[in-house]
Regions:
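GST-like domain detector, emphasizing the conserved glutathione-binding G-site
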Residues: 1-127
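Short, contiguous strand/loop micro-motifs
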Residues: 1-3, 128, 178-179, 203
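Long hydrophobic alpha-helical segments typical of transmembrane helices together
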Residues: 180-207
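GST-like fold's C-terminal all-alpha helical module
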Residues: 100-190
Length: 207
């Protein structure tokens, strides 16, 4: 398999980390949509030129991290999958991850507005909208924080909830300016610190 994308994307990172946790043989090729020569190559696997994209061993191109993770779960089987295949716990986990994904998407939007690689001129930024997105990021993460059930998010063992939320939280913390409302997520921060000691996480931390 071949994973396309940069670990600077929290969505690419969660796929890369999952591949390592599943011990699935793969090649990681760094392709970034904001680099013109890499953009054209990326379009071969995703017409939207978004990351991540996964090329399976039989040549199928999968796009969107949700689709890719579902494929990997089915590949390793229900006994090894980090997401339950059925039941209420699956629904709870996917809902929780969905909140986290929404929070990091708001953070990504803020990054494009006023981050290092901002796309919009400073005088064209609509401050009330950006401030609202920072607030939504905070509210989303703190909602997930309130759902933590043990040493890992869902209880006593690591699941896809931890993989995804660690990748999401790390991106948010790295790119959140000091002027934004302070996050209050001690349990998620503790889980992130613990997870990032594992080689499967530490080897996907972006530079």
């Amino acid at each position: 398999m071949k994973l396309y994308g940069s670990f600077g994307s929290p969505f690419t990172r969660r796929v890369g980390t999952t591949l390592l946790l599943y011990n699935l043989k793969h090649e990681h090729l760094v392709l970034r949509a904001n680099v013109p020569e890499e953009l054209e190559q990326l379009k071969k696997f995703n017409p939207l030129a978004r990351v991540p994209a996964l090329e399976t061993d039989d040549g199928m191109a999968l796009v969107d991290s949700v689709t890719i993770l579902d494929y990997l779960d089915r590949l390793v089987g229900p006994d090894e999958a980090l997401t339950p295949s059925t039941g209420a716990v699956r629904t709870q986990m996917l809902s929780l991850i969905g909140i986290g994904a929404g929070a990091v998407e708001k953070s990504v939007s803020c990054y494009y507005e006023e981050g290092v690689n901002a796309k919009r001129p400073a005088d064209k930024i609509y401050r009330p909208w950006v401030d609202k997105m920072y607030e939504q990021t905070k509210d989303g993460l703190e909602a997930v924080e309130s759902m933590v059930k043990g040493p890992w998010i869902m209880g006593n063992k690591i699941t896809q909830a931890d993989v995804s939320l660690v990748c999401f939280l790390d991106f948010i913390v790295k790119h959140r300016p000091e002027t934004a409302p302070q996050l209050n997520c001690p349990n998620l921060e503790k889980i992130s610190k613990k997870a990032n000691l594992m080689v499967e996480f530490s080897s996907t931390i972006p530079a």
